[in-house]
């Protein structure tokens, strides 16, 4: 074969099977560079196949429900139960039955760049998206568990059309009789995973904004979780207006600074 390595690389990017005549021709090329390109191409195909298989696995709950006659299946998830500061955010997403975007998974397993890209895709292709945000002061009043349910209900209330079935990550919500709670649902249901991405990106952007408003806690990086830098900020600056007073480290910091007044 007279093609250069760079030309072969470009051509292999268009090939989708080992049975392709060009791939077969490359297999006869004894150059080490071509051999490496073939190995890279095979690995790419394997990864793409894994992603397609994962997509089909994660659509199984939705597929079964569509076959039962349900039309608007909402997935619900939340982010922000554990942080010491900021709101808890929930999202609800209704996807069309032909949604086939690979790579959607539990938002915590995705890079920030991948989450941001999928966020835009979901917002564009979803039938409906709802977001519920429950602030720190309500969390302190009702506790984080109840606040999470409030956020989920608020997200579901925004959906138009209304869902006729609800898939929820982990916690029973009793929003409707037609609902199912799935442990680790964001790794099992495409709708819940999509909701986890919407919730995560929404909350992360809020915390990045709060980092500019309340510097000294590293909110842009820790998203309000109790990291070393965040705890150092509590020890040296005290609390800020978005801290959750009912959470132990925040309560202790408040008591300490109140005692100095």
Curated annotation (Swiss-Prot):
GO terms for MF: manganese ion binding; RNA binding; RNA-DNA hybrid ribonuclease activity
Domain RNase H type-2: 71-259
Residues annotated to bind a divalent metal cation: 77-78, 169
Major location (coarse): cytoplasm
CDD domains xrefs: RNase_HII_bacteria_HII_like
Protein's UniProt keywords contain Hydrolase: yes
Reactions catalysed, as given in the entry: Endonucleolytic cleavage to 5'-phosphomonoester
InterPro entries: RNase_HII, RNase_HII/HIII, RNase_HII/HIII_dom, RNaseH-like_sf, RNaseH_sf
Sorted UniProt keywords: Cytoplasm, Endonuclease, Hydrolase, Manganese, Metal-binding, Nuclease
Localization: Cytoplasm
An example Gene Ontology biological process: mismatch repair
Gene Ontology CC entries for this record: cytoplasm; ribonuclease H2 complex
Cofactor(s) recorded in Swiss-Prot or TrEMBL: Mn(2+); Mg(2+)
SUPFAM superfamilies hit by this protein: Ribonuclease H-like
Co-factor binding comment: Manganese or magnesium. Binds 1 divalent metal ion per monomer in the absence of substrate. May bind a second metal ion after substrate binding.
EC code(s) of this entry: 3.1.26.4
Similarity annotation: Belongs to the RNase HII family.
Job description of the protein: Endonuclease that specifically degrades the RNA of RNA-DNA hybrids.
Annotated protein name in UniProt: Ribonuclease HII
Organism: Listeria monocytogenes serotype 4a (strain HCC23)
Organism phylogeny: Bacteria, Bacillati, Bacillota, Bacilli, Bacillales
């Amino acid at each position: 074969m007279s093609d250069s390595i760079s030309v072969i690389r470009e051509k292999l990017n268009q090939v989708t099977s080992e049975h392709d005549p060009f791939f077969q021709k490359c297999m006869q090329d004894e150059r080490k560079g071509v051999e490496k390109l073939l190995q890279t191409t095979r690995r790419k195909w394997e990864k793409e196949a894994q992603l397609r298989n994962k997509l089909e696995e994660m659509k199984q709950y939705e597929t079964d429900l569509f076959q039962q006659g349900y039309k608007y299946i909402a997935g619900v998830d939340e982010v922000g139960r554990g942080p010491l500061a900021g709101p808890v955010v929930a999202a609800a997403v209704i996807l069309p039955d032909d949604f086939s975007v690979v790579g959607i998974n539990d938002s915590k397993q995705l890079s920030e760049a991948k989450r941001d890209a999928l966020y835009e895709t979901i917002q564009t292709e979803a039938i409906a998206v709802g977001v519920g945000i429950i602030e720190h002061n309500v969390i302190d009043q009702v506790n984080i568990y109840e606040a999470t349910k409030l956020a989920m209900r608020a997200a579901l209330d925004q959906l138009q059309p209304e869902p006729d079935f609800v898939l929820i990550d982990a916690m029973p919500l009793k929003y409707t009789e037609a609902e199912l709670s799935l442990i680790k649902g964001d790794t099992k249901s495409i709708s819940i995973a999509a909701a986890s991405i919407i919730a995560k990106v929404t909350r992360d952007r809020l915390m990045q904004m709060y980092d500019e408003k309340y510097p000294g806690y590293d909110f842009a990086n820790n998203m309000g979780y109790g990291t070393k830098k965040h705890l150092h900020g509590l020890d040296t600056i005290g609390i800020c207006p978005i801290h959750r007073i009912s959470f132990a480290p925040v309560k202790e910091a408040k008591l300490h600074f109140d005692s100095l007044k």
